[in-house]
């Protein structure tokens, strides 16, 4: 799949890339102009400097990087974030610091990963009743904790 892109203010940064042959996600880089302090418990919007033209029938999902989450408590607030095929603006990442220490984010740091996925369009059909299942209406915690 080919994805067209514009570098908005990230000409000095690597393009998103798969870090291993088996990777599902491409790493995204922080295109901040200067270091950003992310205090513990705070949220920041991090630019990537990229705009994409995702092929119709696909989306990009923006996900956290597990190493940042484990080591520093740095994760994404809305995960996965969805980039629709018809969006042409800059990809930005909503980052939250859940760690107990402040975190300094530097330009060029790998901040998130992007996974492309096919999109199926749903067609809703109203019915009088739904078929029965073993689970039924069992919701949160219905199988135990």
UniProtKB/Swiss-Prot annotation:
Substrate binds at residues 65-67, 78, 82-84, 92. Pfam families: dUTPase (PF00692). It catalyses: dUTP + H2O = dUMP + diphosphate + H(+). Its cofactor is Mg(2+). It comes from the Bacteria. Keywords: Hydrolase, Magnesium, Metal-binding, Nucleotide metabolism. Pathway: Pyrimidine metabolism; dUMP biosynthesis; dUMP from dCTP (dUTP route): step 2/2. It is an enzyme of class 3 (hydrolase). Its EC number is 3.6.1.23. GO terms for biological process: dUMP biosynthetic process; dUTP catabolic process. GO terms for molecular function: dUTP diphosphatase activity; magnesium ion binding. Disulfide bonds: none annotated. This enzyme is involved in nucleotide metabolism: it produces dUMP, the immediate precursor of thymidine nucleotides and it decreases the intracellular concentration of dUTP so that uracil cannot be incorporated into DNA. NCBIfam families: dut, PRK00601.1. Belongs to the dUTPase family. This is Deoxyuridine 5'-triphosphate nucleotidohydrolase. The gene is dut.
């Amino acid at each position: 799949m080919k994805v067209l892109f514009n570098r908005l203010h990230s000409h000095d940064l690597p393009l998103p890339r798969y870090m291993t042959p088996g990777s599902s996600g491409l790493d995204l880089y922080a295109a901040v102009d200067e270091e950003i302090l992310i205090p513990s418990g705070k949220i920041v919007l991090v630019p990537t400097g990229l705009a994409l033209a995702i092929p119709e029938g696909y989306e990009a999902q923006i996900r956290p990087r597990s190493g940042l989450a484990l080591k520093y408590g740095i994760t994404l607030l809305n995960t996965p974030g969805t980039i629709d095929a018809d969006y042409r603006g800059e990809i930005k990442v909503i980052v939250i610091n859940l760690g107990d220490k402040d975190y300094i984010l530097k330009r060029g740091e790998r901040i998130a990963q992007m996974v492309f996925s096919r999109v199926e369009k749903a067609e809703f059909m109203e019915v009088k009743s739904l078929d029965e299942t073993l689970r039924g209406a069992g919701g949160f915690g219905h199988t135990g904790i």
